């Protein structure tokens, strides 16, 4: 058994990493990054723009969600998938940043769905994760841009990413 549950680790990491309050501008920048890439589905940038327009409502709405365990499993999936691949290029930090960014965007897609429909079914959740995966993970250009942005963009700093998790 692990000495810490994921929630304990999250709380401790936030305490250590987030020296400043959550900045919605950083979240806006993250969404803008994915919105600005060449979409496979024309509705994708429209969905992300809608989320950016509603951040003031969606961020608190997302925090009220009781889906923490599902997002915990999702981040473990991304970590498992990308940390195994990082051995080829030893860029572990970017892979961790992608996992946090992916779950952040997916959780906002879920919050937007919940707000628009009054609920969130398993099918909705799967579709939101599939849409993100299709637009981000399966676009080599988007992934290459993300890996490069990890080193240069403030919205992908550890303090910004820790703020996304709070």
Residue ranges and their predicted role:
Residues 1-166:
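Hydrophobic, aromatic-lined core segments that form the binding pocket/scaffold
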């Amino acid at each position: 058994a692990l000495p810490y549950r994921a929630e304990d680790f999250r709380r401790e990491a936030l305490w250590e990493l987030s020296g400043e309050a959550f900045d919605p501008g950083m979240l806006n920048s993250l969404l803008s990054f994915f919105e600005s890439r060449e979409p496979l589905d024309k509705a994708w940038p429209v969905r992300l723009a809608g989320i950016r327009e509603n951040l003031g409502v969606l961020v608190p709405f997302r925090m009220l969600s009781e889906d923490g365990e599902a997002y915990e499993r999702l981040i473990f999936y991304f970590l498992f998938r990308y940390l195994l691949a990082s051995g080829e290029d030893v860029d572990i930090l970017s892979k961790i940043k992608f996992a946090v960014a992916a779950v952040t965007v997916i959780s906002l897609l879920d919050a937007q769905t919940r707000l628009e429909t009054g609920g969130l079914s398993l099918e909705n959740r799967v579709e939101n994760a599939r849409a993100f995966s299709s637009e981000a993970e399966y676009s080599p250009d988007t992934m290459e841009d993300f890996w490069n942005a990890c080193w240069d963009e403030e919205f992908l700093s550890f303090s910004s990413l820790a703020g996304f998790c709070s």
